[in-house]
């Protein structure tokens, strides 16, 4: 069995402010990738801004990430990143900003690919991207510690994972950010997490880590019966 998870993870209340100096190693100018509202409401965006300011790092904010972000959106963001001379990215939000940030970092580091985003993102020819830090504000997707990025492809009328594997360099996991989530969002993201556990439980390629899924499935069952 071989395991590879290069993301450096900080976990706990206030972990962004306590460990914000870690962002210094990623670059000098950031693009914060997020949505319109939730990151402002739950305080995660403010925490990231304060950390960057304390480090003396400049930044721009791209807050146009929609649910299930499209190839077109990440191409627009990448174009702005190139113009603004961004050299690293901070994703703030759920799976959508985190997945988008990975794709944006790849395109921004390869400007000639921006006008051919579908072709380059879904072609196996290797591409290197800029560093990414992730600040998840929901449970479920796990995108902060996986190499995958799923985008909406309007040309094919479907969602599809890009061909490139790109891990976040840093992840700041503060469970306090979920407190302001709506009931509907909380339910959907918890079901997402449960689905991942079931996937592991049913996986025919079992390994030594599969018992972890059994433990958490039993925990879900216990809570459901309370």
What is each PLM-predicted segment?
Residues 1-88:
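ATP/NTP phosphate-donor binding region
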Residues 16, 41-42, 71, 96-101, ...:
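Short glycine/serine/threonine-rich phosphate/pyrophosphate-binding segments
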Residues 20, 49, 60, 75-78, ...:
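Predominant activation on well-ordered alpha-helical scaffold segments within soluble catalytic domains
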Residues 81-120, 129-137:
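A short, small-residue-rich loop immediately preceding and capping a beta-strand
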Residues 110-207:
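A glycine/threonine-rich phosphate-anchoring loop and its flanking beta-alpha core
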Residues 210-214:
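ABC transporter nucleotide-binding domains
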Residues 215-222:
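Conserved small/polar residues in nucleotide/adenosyl-binding loops
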């Amino acid at each position: 069995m071989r395991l590879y998870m290069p993301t450096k993870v900080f976990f706990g209340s206030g972990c962004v402010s306590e460990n914000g100096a870690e962002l210094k190693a990623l670059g000098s100018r950031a693009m914060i990738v997020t949505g319109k509202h939730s990151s402002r409401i739950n305080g995660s965006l403010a925490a990231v801004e304060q950390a960057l300011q304390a480090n003396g790092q400049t930044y721009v904010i791209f807050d146009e990430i929609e649910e299930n972000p499209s190839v077109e959106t990440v191409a627009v963001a990448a174009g702005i990143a190139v113009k603004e001379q961004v050299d690293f990215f901070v994703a703030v939000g759920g799976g959508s900003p985190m997945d988008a940030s990975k794709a944006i970092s790849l395109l921004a580091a390869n400007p000639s690919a921006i006008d051919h985003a579908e072709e380059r993102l879904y072609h196996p020819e290797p591409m290197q991207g800029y560093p990414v830090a992730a600040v998840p504000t929901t449970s479920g997707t796990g995108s902060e510690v996986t190499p995958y990025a799923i985008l909406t492809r309007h040309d094919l009328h479907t969602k599809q994972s890009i061909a490139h594997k790109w891990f976040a360099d840093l992840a700041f996991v503060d469970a306090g950010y979920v407190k302001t989530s709506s009931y509907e969002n909380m339910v959907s993201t918890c079901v997402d997490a449960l689905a991942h556990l079931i996937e592991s439980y049913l996986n025919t390629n079992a390994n030594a880590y599969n018992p972890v899924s059994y433990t958490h499935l039993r925990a879900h069952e216990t809570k459901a019966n309370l």
